[in-house]
A protein has these predicted regions:
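Conserved anion-binding
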Residues: 11-12, 16-22, 96-171
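Glycine-rich, proline-tolerant flexible connector loops at the mouths of alpha/beta enzymes
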Residues: 45-61, 103, 165-175
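Catalytic cores of alpha/beta
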Residues: 72, 76-98, 180-216
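Glycine/small-residue-rich loop that forms an oxyanion/phosphate-binding "nest" at active or ligand-binding sites
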Residues: 52, 60-117
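Glycine-rich phosphate-binding active-site loops on the catalytic face of alpha/beta enzymes
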Residues: 90-111, 167-169, 198-205, 212-232
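Short beta-strand/loop segments at the ligand-binding rim of alpha/beta enzyme cores
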Residues: 2, 22, 71-78, 121-125, ...
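Short, basic, low-complexity termini and linkers enriched in Ser/Thr/Gly/Pro
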Residues: 238-257
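Conserved, mostly hydrophobic/aromatic
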Residues: 8, 38, 46, 91, ...
């Protein structure tokens, strides 16, 4: 499976939360230094979340994204606060290979579908953040009235390929991922490139997700807290299925891929 380390950013610093609660913020240092550390260890992908952006409903930490994409060769997906066409283009121009969007697919479905058509399914990741079976939005501060099943049904049928699913009650707890939830998604949508997120607390959790047939996993706090080690043995299991490379935007069209 594909291993995807995560960097969450608040006020330009690398942080982790527990269950999306901003009051539980723990600071781990500089995002660029952490990204370079992941690259030095042999990682190829990176998931970057602008938590300030998610909370304020517009992209905030674009400078941190730009620094990472400029000074590393990591393939970066970026999310958090992407609500407008300008936000999306800004993220791509700052070097994001993919952009994760979730709230907009709830609040403005036509805009998400327009992006899907314009930029293509390979350039977007649908963020499916779930709490008690319902999709949450805006930095997990609000619960929508949309069930996860209905959310996925609509957008997989529309051509979505990549889904990042976070079980909010597990996120940052290190108590283990929601494997049964992810298995149920894969059973219904075997064509989905599902990225599991939330709860990973050990190497065994990663191996369990791999055994369950989950294509990719995001992890963060488990690494920062020393619960998992990016050992050569684990890195050998990193099957890079993403074929995305960093692309440039010219007049809102993708070039130089």
């Amino acid at each position: 499976m594909e291993l995807v380390p995560a960097i969450d950013i608040i006020e330009g610093k690398c942080v982790r939360l527990t269950k999306g609660d901003y009051d539980t913020k723990k600071v781990y240092g500089d995002p660029l230094e952490m990204a370079q550390q992941f690259e030095d260890l042999g990682m190829r992908r990176l998931h970057v979340v602008d938590l300030d952006g998610a909370k304020s409903k517009h992209v905030v930490n674009i400078a941190a994204l730009k620094a990472i994409t400029t000074h590393t060769n990591l393939v970066v997906d970026f999310g958090g606060g992407v609500k407008t066409d300008e936000d999306l283009v800004m993220a791509y121009e700052a070097g994001a290979a993919m952009v994760t969007v979730g709230s907009i697919a709830i609040t403005d479905p036509d805009r998400y579908l327009g992006w899907l058509q314009k930029y293509g399914a390979d350039k977007l990741i649908l963020g499916a953040d779930v709490r008690n079976g319902m999709v949450s939005i805006n930095g997990w501060k609000e619960d929508s009235d949309v069930r996860l099943e209905d959310f996925l049904l609509r957008y997989m049928a529309a051509g979505t390929k990549n889904v990042l699913c976070t079980e909010i009650s597990r996120d940052g707890t290190l108590e283990g991922p929601a494997i049964e939830l992810y298995k149920s998604i894969m059973a219904r949508y075997p064509e989905c490139y599902l990225i599991a997120s939330g709860g990973v607390g050990s190497t065994e959790d990663i191996l369990a997700l791999e055994a369950a047939g989950i294509p990719a996993v995001v992890f963060g706090k488990a690494y920062y807290e020393g619960k998992i080690s990016l050992s050569p043995a684990l890195l050998k299991r990193d099957g890079r299925k993403s074929k995305i490379v960093n692309c440039k935007l010219s007049n809102s069209k993708l070039t130089s891929c």
